[in-house]
Amino acid sequence: MIQMQTNLDVADNSGARRVMCIKVLGGSKRKYAGVGDIIVVSVKEAIPRGRVKKGDVMKAVVVRTAKDVRRPDGSVIRFDRNAAVLINNQKEPIGTRIFGPVPRELRARNHMKIISLAPEVL
């Protein structure tokens, strides 16, 4: 469950290390984002010579949340940290690699490029 001012790790090699959510997209009164939702983020920490730099405002897909995600079969999946993948306006990842596992809920949200780049889908 991601809301405004939430800090997230970046799970790709776009050059950003930490980002902060500044808006949850999908309705004017929407407060929270979950796995697969698109948010607007500000880059708070970045590596030198990366594709993005500190202060950039980007869109991102939430790929991991510390709040558990319930599945239709009753099972629950949760992660240790909140993480996101930076995307462009065509909803394609900016980075060329994804680090760490991603949940299969991304498939239902049509983020197939992220699924294909991920080393493990839970």
UniProtKB/Swiss-Prot annotation:
<dbReference type="GO" id="GO:0070180">
    <property type="term" value="F:large ribosomal subunit rRNA binding"/>
</dbReference>
<keyword id="KW-0694">RNA-binding</keyword>
<protein>
    <recommendedName>
        <fullName>Large ribosomal subunit protein uL14</fullName>
    </recommendedName>
</protein>
<dbReference type="GO" id="GO:0003735">
    <property type="term" value="F:structural constituent of ribosome"/>
</dbReference>
<keyword id="KW-0689">Ribosomal protein</keyword>
<keyword id="KW-0687">Ribonucleoprotein</keyword>
<dbReference type="InterPro" id="IPR019972">
    <property type="entry name" value="Ribosomal_uL14_CS"/>
</dbReference>
<dbReference type="InterPro" id="IPR005745">
    <property type="entry name" value="Ribosomal_uL14_bac-type"/>
</dbReference>
<dbReference type="Pfam" id="PF00238">
    <property type="entry name" value="Ribosomal_L14"/>
</dbReference>
<comment type="subunit">
    <text>Part of the 50S ribosomal subunit. Forms a cluster with proteins L3 and L19. In the 70S ribosome, L14 and L19 interact and together make contacts with the 16S rRNA in bridges B5 and B8.</text>
</comment>
<dbReference type="InterPro" id="IPR036853">
    <property type="entry name" value="Ribosomal_uL14_sf"/>
</dbReference>
<comment type="similarity">
    <text>Belongs to the universal ribosomal protein uL14 family.</text>
</comment>
<keyword id="KW-0699">rRNA-binding</keyword>
<comment type="function">
    <text>Binds to 23S rRNA. Forms part of two intersubunit bridges in the 70S ribosome.</text>
</comment>
<dbReference type="InterPro" id="IPR000218">
    <property type="entry name" value="Ribosomal_uL14"/>
</dbReference>
<dbReference type="GO" id="GO:0006412">
    <property type="term" value="P:translation"/>
</dbReference>
<dbReference type="GO" id="GO:0022625">
    <property type="term" value="C:cytosolic large ribosomal subunit"/>
</dbReference>
